[in-house]
Amino acid sequence: VQPRICAITNIALDHTRYLGSTLAEIAFEKAGILKKNIPAVLGRMDPEAQRVIEQEAAACAVPLFRWGIEYEAEKGGSPLTPVLTYRGNGKVFENVQLGLAGMHQIENAAIALTVALQLQSDFPRLTDSAIISGLEKAVWPGRLERLLDSPPVLMDVAHNPAGCAALVEA
């Protein structure tokens, strides 16, 4: 399979039995998805992990879109109703209320938005409004899923330290 674009979200100590015991080892394994001359979007990550991925990308002539450099996002709203402000790819999107709960979803949405904007030239129906609508309507059962309003009852399937930290932050 030849991708049109690749994305690597944050790097955390997860699946260490398969990917490695350090962030650098895990980053190296995740960089395995990079393909020669195919652009890649990197989420916010540990500087050491990012250096590893940047080295692998340079070796494959992979154009990178990096959090905080080629694009950025500001967090707003509340944990149950996060609001994204995005700047990147020559565009600005303000006050996008995400369908997914959790402030960490702002980072995930910014990655997805960057990927989608890069694909617009290949997919004419992938308009700015369609992308924003998708972010607003997205749902993920089991991820900060509201089961009851009164009293408030939430369910989450966090299973690693990074996921648990995001859950606590929410």
Per-region residue spans from a language model:
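Nucleotide phosphate-binding/pyrophosphate-handling subdomain across enzymes
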Residues: 1-7, 11-12, 16, 25, ...
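Flexible active-site lid/hinge loop adjacent to a nucleotide/diphosphate
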Residues: 1-48
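Extended acidic/charged loop-beta regions that coordinate divalent cations
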Residues: 1-18, 50-93
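Generic secondary-structure signature for well-ordered alpha-helical cores
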Residues: 31, 35, 55-63, 118-124, ...
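Conserved beta-strand segments of alpha/beta enzyme cores
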Residues: 39, 63-65, 152
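Conserved beta-strand termini and adjacent loop/short-helix elements that scaffold enzyme active sites
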Residues: 43, 67-69, 147
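Glycine-rich beta-alpha junction loops
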Residues: 46, 70-73, 100-102, 159
